[in-house]
């Protein structure tokens, strides 16, 4: 039986060490045959690095690795292209100077592997020199692959001045790709975020963005069909409805996909856990929610237009865009009005909804994880037993536990939405189905909570502190 490729990001290692591989090479063949410059944005831990590594092996002519895969009979293995593989995934870039040092080291590593000595000292010129020399010495055009193209910026997103300086350095680097067009066979850039072309790719305006192209929706991630076809040796006893509820649901305008990191760890451990969520901290996102005073129930009703979808930048980061790009929200549906497309966002699955709301709840209440969990357990027990006296008492205790200073600092504390956000996050973090602003023929319900075969309707009212009853 083959091994689960947990944490494997190198295609050659995956194949040679007998790991499972979900064959994405039909899409790779199509990309190579129909275009030249590509960009793909996907959330972290979604298989982007493995995709880049697979492209590198294909263009390098490593035919033996593709035995039994689609590409074996749909690729010209007689031609080997020189490949420049750049990855900013290792370590943190702490300044524009470090960015230059890191990039120079990667260029020199590639040059050394092809026995080339670079003479240019300026980084952009050195990059251009490497591309030209590789073309000349190998008599084949060059393939440029850039992984985690945006990580140096995202690592410093809370320091706008530094992030902008790093962005300018990257723009100078990426502009070389367009200027080197006569020497380039294929270029592919991946990252988490989609920075606007004006800010980062002004010199590379021929980049084809396939992030929301339905044809390539499953280029990264696993479809339900792929899981059942490839991992059949590890599927005994798997409840596919629960697997989908927990880890499926990412919609890039094609077939919905699972997060591969979640699937592999679940198949290994057979426990439904927040595997993907625990690999990163949403601290910057939580900070933005707090600063902008967003209401948490509104997260499932966010609407974003195409302009906002492509306007992610250091100076202007819309929360809707941030939630989508980082994988905490996904596309629920698309609506066209007056020739414009509008994207309705929602949580992709139970893991993300429960985990994110758990973080949000701790921030909303300014309480520790243990305190919040204790209150959640009491509320859950009260709901499951339909014990309304206990439910009321549990709610009173939950709000009483919030520090007074936190109330005074929070501008939303005088509004119903603040309390609705706390209760929404409390139940959503438990994995319950919670519907905010549920529309009925009698009006709108503030909050609807579904548990087993019970439906709980909750309304919120904030009374004037001077009034004793209302």
Model-derived features with residue positions:
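Structural signature of nuclease core domains in nucleic-acid processing machines
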Residues: 388-470
